[in-house]
Design a protein with these regions (language model features):
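Acidic, contiguous N-terminal accessory segments
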Residues: 2-91, 131-146
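Feature activates predominantly on carbohydrate-active enzymes
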Residues: 36-39, 43, 61, 82-176
Length: 176
């Protein structure tokens, strides 16, 4: 099911360097859901200068705008059918002033977060180099999206892992 043609909603992430929303996780998040929320908080913070708080879904105060990351109860109530999503499939859906970034297990929610960050111009170029734009005020129209990678196993190896790099043999080994 592809939702990109539907209209979305405007979400205010930050205004003048101040966060306008909280980030919610399921009360018992998976490792990838936790990583996704941490990345979202970190990179939104780098972009806007704001501090984005991550809380368990059950600790979210009423009346706040929230980004729900992972397989939350809120997403379930908004008709996200987790059991119909493949392992890497993601869903992005605005609901009023809230945003759902969710997906199949194990890693779909992580891909939802990075799809959104990429839409904002945020990219991890290499292991130690990021491209992060500067937006003290960040408001965006968020169109609904449900997608998945064309194929699994999308790794690019541009060198040997560090453990396989040149190492020097000990003198004892060389002498024998």
């Amino acid at each position: 099911m592809f939702l990109s043609c539907l209209s979305g909603g405007e979400i205010s992430f930050a205004e003048n360097g101040k966060a306008q929303c909280l980030i919610a996780l399921p009360d018992k998040p998976t490792g990838f859901e936790r990583d996704a929320a941490d990345d979202l908080s970190s990179y939104l913070g780098q972009m806007t200068g704001a501090k984005f708080t991550v809380l368990p879904e059950s600790k979210i105060p009423a009346g706040k705008s929230v980004i729900y990351v992972g397989q939350t109860n809120y997403a379930r109530k908004q008709n996200i059918r987790f059991n119909q999503l493949s392992a890497e499939e993601w869903v992005i859906k605005a609901t009023g002033s809230n945003l759902i970034l969710s997906g199949g297990k194990p890693i779909g929610s992580f891909y939802a977060v990075w799809t959104l960050l990429n839409q904002f111009g945020c990219y991890c170029l290499t292991w130690d180099q990021d491209a992060v734009p500067n937006h003290k005020t960040l408001k965006r129209e968020i169109r609904p999206e449900q997608s998945k990678p064309s194929f699994s196993g999308r790794f690019i190896y541009n060198r040997y892992p560090p453990i396989l790099k040149y190492t020097q043999a000990s003198a004892q080994v060389i002498q024998n």
